[in-house]
């Protein structure tokens, strides 16, 4: 749809490992209510300095490419995005448009 990257809102739920930078777990709920889990370096999710002593959950985001936008039959605005791969092996998601920012 466009070449600019957008951001998808996620919840950073826990600190996983004290590497440099640290590794955290983040969760994304898609438009159908399915929760997807991501595990990666802190800077991919937030500019905050997070560690094992930080409070969780915290707001975060992931860069994503917007593939398409539409409204479903109920008038709900949806967006298909591509981002890093979840631990379930999925990298394309349909989310609510309110979860995506430019």
What are the language-model segments listed below?
Residues 61-102:
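Short, compact, well-ordered microdomains
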Residues 30-34, 85-87:
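Solvent-exposed strand-loop boundary residues in beta-sheet-rich modules
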Residues 33-55, 91-101:
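Beta-strand/loop nucleic-acid-binding surfaces
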Residues 19-27, 74-81:
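Short aromatic-glycine-enriched beta-strand elements
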Residues 3-18, 63-68:
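Structural detector for short beta-strands of small beta-barrel domains
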